[in-house]
Curated annotation (Swiss-Prot):
Location of the protein in the cell: Virion
Name the record gives this protein: Structural DNA-binding protein p10
Keywords from the UniProt entry: DNA-binding, Late protein, Virion
Keyword check for DNA-binding: yes
Keyword DNA repair: no
Role this protein plays: May play a role in genome packaging through direct interaction with viral DNA. Binds to ssDNA and dsDNA with the same apparent affinity in vitro.
Family classification: Belongs to the asfivirus P10 family.
Region of interest: Disordered: 1-41
Induction trigger: Expressed in the early phase of the viral replicative cycle.
GO cellular component: virion component
Coiled coil region boundaries: none
Low complexity composition bias: residue spans: 1-24
GO molecular function terms noted in the UniProt entry: DNA binding
Amino acid sequence: MPTKAGTKSTANKKTTKGSSKSGSPRGHTGKTHAPPSMHSGMLYKDMVNIARSKGIPIYQNGTRLTKSELEKKIRRSK
């Protein structure tokens, strides 16, 4: 009797572990979760749009401003 119970409990443990791990092969690819762009509050696109609407130039001496530079300018113009 005790041997049967013992094998049962170990078998149950194994199956629960296995199913949770191998049951979802796509679990840790990051595709199921929201894309990283969703996590950053303001996207570069949004920054450019705000800058345009406020009349802040996006380009400076031939190169495009970085997100942080745009952010600074937008904050200053507020």
